[in-house]
Amino acid sequence: MSKIIGIDLGTTFSAIAELDDLGNPEVLSDPESGNRITRSVVYFGKDKVIVGEKAKDAAVTKRDKVVFEVKSQMENDVIYSLKDGKFIDDNGKSKGYTPSQISSLILSKLSDYTSKVKKAVITIPAQFADRARGATLEAAKLSKLDVELIHEPTAAILHYANMPNVSLNGRVMVFDLGGGTFDISIAKVIGKKVDIMTSVGDKHLGGQDFDREIIKILDKKYKKSKGKGLDDKDPVILDIAERIKKLL
Protein backbone atom coordinates (compact mmCIF):
# COMPACT_ATOMS: atom_id res chain seq x y z
CA MET A 1 0.00 0.00 0.00
CA SER A 2 1.36 3.41 -0.94
CA LYS A 3 2.13 5.93 1.75
CA ILE A 4 -0.29 8.73 2.57
CA ILE A 5 0.98 11.99 4.00
CA GLY A 6 -0.80 14.38 6.34
CA ILE A 7 -0.49 18.12 5.76
CA ASP A 8 -1.38 21.03 8.01
CA LEU A 9 -1.71 23.90 5.55
CA GLY A 10 -1.74 26.70 8.11
CA THR A 11 -2.24 30.45 8.03
CA THR A 12 1.17 31.24 9.51
CA PHE A 13 2.95 27.86 9.58
CA SER A 14 2.53 24.58 7.69
CA ALA A 15 3.77 21.06 8.38
CA ILE A 16 3.83 17.60 6.82
CA ALA A 17 3.90 14.15 8.42
CA GLU A 18 3.96 10.53 7.32
CA LEU A 19 3.71 7.18 9.08
CA ASP A 20 6.98 5.43 9.85
CA ASP A 21 7.52 1.68 9.41
CA LEU A 22 5.85 1.03 12.79
CA GLY A 23 2.79 3.06 11.89
CA ASN A 24 3.69 6.06 14.06
CA PRO A 25 3.30 9.59 12.65
CA GLU A 26 6.55 11.42 12.03
CA VAL A 27 6.69 15.14 11.26
CA LEU A 28 9.17 15.72 8.45
CA SER A 29 11.81 18.42 8.60
CA ASP A 30 12.75 20.96 5.95
CA PRO A 31 16.03 19.59 4.51
CA GLU A 32 17.40 23.13 4.21
CA SER A 33 16.61 24.57 7.65
CA GLY A 34 16.00 21.43 9.71
CA ASN A 35 12.76 22.96 11.04
CA ARG A 36 9.68 20.76 11.42
CA ILE A 37 7.36 23.65 10.63
CA THR A 38 7.49 25.85 7.54
CA ARG A 39 6.42 29.46 7.31
CA SER A 40 3.35 29.82 5.08
CA VAL A 41 5.02 32.72 3.30
CA VAL A 42 5.87 33.04 -0.40
CA TYR A 43 8.36 35.44 -2.00
CA PHE A 44 8.12 36.11 -5.73
CA GLY A 45 11.65 37.01 -6.81
CA LYS A 46 12.75 38.08 -10.26
CA ASP A 47 14.15 34.68 -11.16
CA LYS A 48 12.73 32.33 -8.52
CA VAL A 49 10.03 31.73 -5.95
CA ILE A 50 10.96 31.11 -2.32
CA VAL A 51 8.74 29.54 0.35
CA GLY A 52 9.33 29.57 4.09
CA GLU A 53 11.57 31.45 6.52
CA LYS A 54 13.73 32.99 3.78
CA ALA A 55 10.58 34.35 2.14
CA LYS A 56 9.62 36.02 5.42
CA ASP A 57 13.10 37.54 5.70
CA ALA A 58 12.78 38.97 2.18
CA ALA A 59 9.77 41.01 3.30
CA VAL A 60 12.04 43.41 5.19
CA THR A 61 13.26 44.93 1.92
CA LYS A 62 10.77 43.61 -0.67
CA ARG A 63 7.44 43.58 1.11
CA ASP A 64 5.36 43.99 -2.05
CA LYS A 65 6.76 40.71 -3.42
CA VAL A 66 5.95 38.65 -0.32
CA VAL A 67 2.61 36.98 0.43
CA PHE A 68 1.52 36.29 4.02
CA GLU A 69 -1.62 34.58 5.36
CA VAL A 70 -2.91 33.38 1.99
CA LYS A 71 -5.14 30.86 3.78
CA SER A 72 -7.37 33.71 4.94
CA GLN A 73 -8.07 34.53 1.26
CA MET A 74 -9.07 31.03 0.12
CA GLU A 75 -12.79 31.81 -0.08
CA ASN A 76 -12.34 35.13 -1.89
CA ASP A 77 -12.31 35.83 -5.63
CA VAL A 78 -9.04 37.76 -5.52
CA ILE A 79 -5.53 37.67 -6.91
CA TYR A 80 -2.23 38.77 -5.42
CA SER A 81 -1.01 41.55 -7.69
CA LEU A 82 2.77 41.91 -7.78
CA LYS A 83 2.23 45.38 -9.22
CA ASP A 84 0.09 46.49 -6.27
CA GLY A 85 1.78 44.30 -3.67
CA LYS A 86 -1.52 43.11 -2.21
CA PHE A 87 -4.65 41.06 -2.84
CA ILE A 88 -7.11 42.80 -5.15
CA ASP A 89 -10.50 41.94 -6.64
CA ASP A 90 -10.09 39.66 -9.63
CA ASN A 91 -11.73 41.50 -12.50
CA GLY A 92 -10.04 39.37 -15.13
CA LYS A 93 -7.82 42.22 -16.30
CA SER A 94 -5.00 42.16 -13.77
CA LYS A 95 -2.12 39.71 -13.73
CA GLY A 96 -1.29 37.93 -10.52
CA TYR A 97 -1.61 34.77 -8.47
CA THR A 98 -4.79 33.28 -7.05
CA PRO A 99 -4.87 32.01 -3.45
CA SER A 100 -4.95 28.45 -4.83
CA GLN A 101 -1.84 29.03 -6.94
CA ILE A 102 0.05 30.51 -3.99
CA SER A 103 -1.06 27.70 -1.67
CA SER A 104 0.08 25.15 -4.24
CA LEU A 105 3.60 26.54 -3.97
CA ILE A 106 3.54 25.90 -0.21
CA LEU A 107 2.16 22.40 -0.76
CA SER A 108 4.82 21.65 -3.36
CA LYS A 109 7.58 22.66 -0.96
CA LEU A 110 6.14 20.45 1.78
CA SER A 111 5.68 17.45 -0.51
CA ASP A 112 9.33 17.77 -1.54
CA TYR A 113 10.24 16.70 2.01
CA THR A 114 9.17 13.16 1.16
CA SER A 115 9.66 11.00 -1.91
CA LYS A 116 7.10 10.08 -4.54
CA VAL A 117 4.07 10.40 -2.26
CA LYS A 118 1.07 11.77 -4.10
CA LYS A 119 -1.82 10.93 -1.75
CA ALA A 120 -2.46 13.23 1.19
CA VAL A 121 -4.91 14.32 3.85
CA ILE A 122 -5.04 18.08 4.38
CA THR A 123 -6.50 19.58 7.54
CA ILE A 124 -8.76 22.61 7.13
CA PRO A 125 -10.61 24.93 9.55
CA ALA A 126 -14.05 23.79 10.70
CA GLN A 127 -15.59 26.99 9.32
CA PHE A 128 -14.21 26.60 5.78
CA ALA A 129 -17.06 27.14 3.31
CA ASP A 130 -17.45 25.21 0.06
CA ARG A 131 -15.53 27.85 -1.88
CA ALA A 132 -12.53 27.66 0.46
CA ARG A 133 -12.64 23.86 0.35
CA GLY A 134 -12.70 23.98 -3.43
CA ALA A 135 -9.76 26.39 -3.50
CA THR A 136 -7.79 24.04 -1.24
CA LEU A 137 -8.55 21.09 -3.51
CA GLU A 138 -7.47 23.17 -6.51
CA ALA A 139 -4.19 24.02 -4.77
CA ALA A 140 -3.59 20.31 -4.17
CA LYS A 141 -4.35 19.54 -7.81
CA LEU A 142 -1.86 22.18 -8.97
CA SER A 143 0.80 20.61 -6.76
CA LYS A 144 -0.07 17.17 -8.18
CA LEU A 145 -1.49 15.77 -4.94
CA ASP A 146 -4.54 13.52 -4.61
CA VAL A 147 -6.14 14.70 -1.37
CA GLU A 148 -8.94 14.31 1.12
CA LEU A 149 -9.91 17.10 3.51
CA ILE A 150 -10.59 16.84 7.25
CA HIS A 151 -11.37 19.42 9.93
CA GLU A 152 -8.33 20.31 12.02
CA PRO A 153 -9.80 19.58 15.49
CA THR A 154 -11.40 16.40 14.14
CA ALA A 155 -7.98 15.18 13.04
CA ALA A 156 -6.71 15.78 16.59
CA ILE A 157 -9.54 13.71 18.09
CA LEU A 158 -8.88 10.82 15.69
CA HIS A 159 -5.18 10.93 16.54
CA TYR A 160 -5.65 10.76 20.30
CA ALA A 161 -8.38 8.12 20.06
CA ASN A 162 -5.98 5.85 18.18
CA MET A 163 -2.89 6.40 20.31
CA PRO A 164 -1.47 3.30 22.04
CA ASN A 165 -2.36 2.96 25.72
CA VAL A 166 -4.97 5.72 25.47
CA SER A 167 -8.60 4.97 26.28
CA LEU A 168 -11.15 7.68 25.60
CA ASN A 169 -14.78 7.08 26.50
CA GLY A 170 -17.56 9.65 26.39
CA ARG A 171 -17.80 13.09 24.85
CA VAL A 172 -14.56 14.79 23.92
CA MET A 173 -14.09 18.46 23.02
CA VAL A 174 -10.99 19.64 21.17
CA PHE A 175 -9.99 23.29 20.80
CA ASP A 176 -7.69 24.28 17.94
CA LEU A 177 -6.29 27.80 18.22
CA GLY A 178 -4.33 28.40 15.03
CA GLY A 179 -2.69 31.30 13.27
CA GLY A 180 -5.90 32.44 11.63
CA THR A 181 -8.84 30.57 13.16
CA PHE A 182 -10.19 29.12 16.40
CA ASP A 183 -12.01 25.81 15.90
CA ILE A 184 -13.84 23.37 18.14
CA SER A 185 -14.94 19.80 17.49
CA ILE A 186 -17.08 17.67 19.80
CA ALA A 187 -17.07 13.90 19.38
CA LYS A 188 -18.47 10.83 21.08
CA VAL A 189 -15.59 8.42 21.57
CA ILE A 190 -15.85 4.80 22.64
CA GLY A 191 -12.49 3.09 22.46
CA LYS A 192 -11.27 3.53 18.91
CA LYS A 193 -14.70 4.42 17.54
CA VAL A 194 -15.16 8.14 16.93
CA ASP A 195 -18.47 9.81 16.08
CA ILE A 196 -18.05 13.52 15.27
CA MET A 197 -21.06 15.39 16.65
CA THR A 198 -20.24 18.92 15.54
CA SER A 199 -17.42 21.16 14.31
CA VAL A 200 -17.54 24.97 14.42
CA GLY A 201 -15.03 27.78 14.15
CA ASP A 202 -14.32 31.50 14.18
CA LYS A 203 -12.21 32.71 11.27
CA HIS A 204 -11.43 36.02 12.97
CA LEU A 205 -9.84 34.61 16.12
CA GLY A 206 -6.30 33.34 15.71
CA GLY A 207 -2.68 34.19 16.34
CA GLN A 208 -2.59 36.85 13.64
CA ASP A 209 -5.56 38.59 15.29
CA PHE A 210 -3.68 38.68 18.59
CA ASP A 211 -0.72 40.21 16.73
CA ARG A 212 -2.94 42.96 15.35
CA GLU A 213 -4.35 43.78 18.78
CA ILE A 214 -0.81 44.02 20.18
CA ILE A 215 0.14 46.36 17.31
CA LYS A 216 -2.86 48.57 18.17
CA ILE A 217 -1.54 48.92 21.72
CA LEU A 218 1.98 49.65 20.46
CA ASP A 219 0.61 52.15 17.95
CA LYS A 220 -1.31 54.02 20.64
CA LYS A 221 1.78 54.29 22.84
CA TYR A 222 4.00 55.26 19.90
CA LYS A 223 1.60 58.01 18.81
CA LYS A 224 1.55 59.40 22.33
CA SER A 225 5.35 59.39 22.47
CA LYS A 226 6.33 60.33 18.89
CA GLY A 227 3.24 62.00 17.51
CA LYS A 228 2.85 59.57 14.61
CA GLY A 229 1.56 56.04 14.13
CA LEU A 230 3.19 52.74 13.24
CA ASP A 231 2.99 50.97 9.89
CA ASP A 232 0.98 47.86 10.78
CA LYS A 233 2.21 46.17 7.59
CA ASP A 234 5.89 46.67 8.38
CA PRO A 235 7.50 43.20 8.74
CA VAL A 236 9.68 44.49 11.58
CA ILE A 237 6.61 45.67 13.52
CA LEU A 238 4.82 42.40 12.81
CA ASP A 239 7.83 40.46 14.06
CA ILE A 240 7.96 42.51 17.27
CA ALA A 241 4.24 41.88 17.89
CA GLU A 242 4.73 38.14 17.36
CA ARG A 243 7.64 38.10 19.81
CA ILE A 244 5.58 39.94 22.44
CA LYS A 245 2.73 37.46 21.95
CA LYS A 246 5.07 34.53 22.53
CA LEU A 247 6.43 36.15 25.70
CA LEU A 248 2.90 36.60 27.00
Predicted regions and their residues:
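Hydrophobic alpha-helical hairpins/lids featuring a short glycine-rich hinge
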Residues: T98-S100
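Short, well-ordered amphipathic alpha-helical segments that serve as non-catalytic structural scaffolds
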Residues: L105-Y113
